[in-house]
């Protein structure tokens, strides 16, 4: 059976830099930081007191208030981004095509704020105060479940959980379902909402977060010599994927093609990347092989780029090992410098941004590179966006447990 082509026909996002594609992309290209002091809880006693918060989001624009009360915030974000993507795609689910449409939207952690609130209720008021909606309000596959119900989707309905690679893996696996003939259209991506006491406190305890409380907007500084950890973010990025001939037949707008998908495992450490970048190298090369693309065809790479001392260096080394001399010709960018790290939502949001980079032929900047680390010696599109030719782009995501993913996007 010949391999079916997969294209992107709809985009949606909720993010620290905007709550729709137009606003988010505009702020990203302008280099505006979405990192602010935490307002969702009193962070006075925490070592990190800032995050990439979603601002101005009205859940009732997407979900009736009565229903929204029975969902954790990550579900709100995922549903909203999914609804945006479906509207953008112009695709209609009908009784005739419903079994050929699927959804795979995941989360790295899921309903942590709901778990915190419910635990407090349990301790203070006893087990009878636990909401009957607690479990479906918290579990990770409920974004996919709600989108399936809302649109009448009767094909594959699942969610993946692979830490910070979740959103990318969801998109990659959704693309393969289309390639292999299991679906014609898929909604795919990731969402997260862990700007909460346990979310901030847990990563702070692991010494993973920046502590630059005096200037949150400059705290996320990938590849800068003075980077001191990542900044937690929240939101969602979701896209509609479609079989190419199916999209053409209905006259759909096509943003880009998903040409390749690769995965690898570090087999090294619970939280630290391989210092020689080998997991990243193998992952990128697997994606390029899957796409049938040579290394010298790649011009843009949206990196994992978390602003951690170990991670940024390991990814740089991995890129150089994968691309050889061509690595210096690639524009590498980290949009986390503006959004923070959305954990399981990051691969979804950043894949949306990568598709927009291909579609608009622009690399967003990596802001906050004030003193570039000499050991990180690639072109990181420092501080200003750049118009450029992008025929082939890569997107990397890496997660705790040594789980890696890379997507290859091509201009159509």
Where are these regions (language model features)?
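Condensing-enzyme catalytic core mediating Claisen C-C bond formation in acyl metabolism
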Residues: 5-9, 36, 214-291, 300
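Active-site-adjacent elements of ketosynthase-type condensing enzymes
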Residues: 43, 47-53, 110-114, 193-220, ...
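Short beta-strand-to-turn element immediately C-terminal to the catalytic PLP-Schiff-base lysine
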Residues: 16, 239-243, 289, 320, ...
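ACP-dependent fatty acid/polyketide chain-elongation machinery
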Residues: 1-67, 245-257, 352-367, 410-412
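Active-site-proximal alpha-helical scaffold in enzymes
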Residues: 78-91, 140-144, 148-151, 156-192, ...
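Conserved beta-ketoacyl condensing-enzyme motif
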Residues: 8, 24-25, 29-162, 191-202, ...
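Glycine-/small-residue-rich "gating" segment that lines the acyl/pantetheine channel
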Residues: 124-131, 169-172, 176, 180, ...
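Flexible, low-complexity linker/loop segments at domain and module junctions
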Residues: 1-8, 95-98, 291-297, 328, ...
